[in-house]
């Protein structure tokens, strides 16, 4: 992460204070955190019935207040995620938290649609599913929780979160803060809840629970597969491998800036981060020069061969061609390249190999 500045130190202090304030005994639902799936779903269902009965204007007020509170907490939650998971870049997590807080659509997406004609009038009004079960990943715990929350409650739903076990503390902190903001604005308690000790088993229980009407999953292939077999509607986001295509019409300086910004964002742990670069042959040298001018490290074939031995150091699992070294996931290029004897600073955000 590099040297701590005054802002970082202040966030650490806020984090510790908040942590001490939240130690109020065992989870039992008073803060939206439940020890078992059934209790969480039952409380969430009660809250959803109250929530869906409120006027749409009240939803707007609550969501506006929630956004305000989440903006205030963006830095502390970013620190919490970085501290617990050890993945990505703290400063990028702040930007990510603010992005989903400000840009996730709210009730403005619920506009009714009407058709009229010779056969009469048809009115389309969107209705809530009810209780939604959401499985969140270790790579994107805070932003996924915020995004899911705003979108789901805007539609009149409630949500039960099952966090990745390696991100349970920061996800719990987010859920508690969300619940407090909703109640402050006049919404019902337990509209957004979580599982105190999330596991693979609790995730499976949540996906198959008769009290949930929809499953939302953000994660790897295995959890997505389970969700698709759960017997109910599922919205799933799995692994991503997005390409960048650069041709001779591109502004190469701008392209280089965008490539580094997108591919290095939060150390490429987001599925939508660009991961492949395809370039028209006639401009390769010019684009490489533009990337190097922005401190991008271009690896040689020999360096890549050494790096592959570090990145794919784990035994391959069944059905996989290679085993990924999990210790390298989400780390700065400086930490990864150090493993093969290349020393660069943390200001090097991206390394590219052909």
What residue spans do the PLM features occupy?
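Short, solvent-exposed polar/charged micro-motifs at secondary-structure junctions
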Residues: 101-104, 202-206, 310-315
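Structural signal for hydrophobic packing residues in well-ordered secondary-structure cores
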Residues: 17-24, 45-52, 66-74, 78-81, ...
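N-terminal Rossmann-like NAD(P)+-binding subdomain of aldehyde/semialdehyde dehydrogenases
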Residues: 1-123, 151, 293
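Conserved active-site and cofactor/substrate-binding residues in soluble primary-metabolism enzymes
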Residues: 4-11, 32-42, 54-61, 65, ...
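Short glycine-rich or small-residue beta-strand-to-loop segments that form or flank ligand, phosphate
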Residues: 47-50, 62-66, 133-135, 160-164, ...
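Rossmann-like NAD(P) dinucleotide-binding subdomain of oxidoreductase/dehydrogenase enzymes
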Residues: 112-254
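ALDH superfamily catalytic-core signature
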Residues: 146, 224-354
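A general secondary-structure junction signal
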Residues: 81-85, 196-198, 354
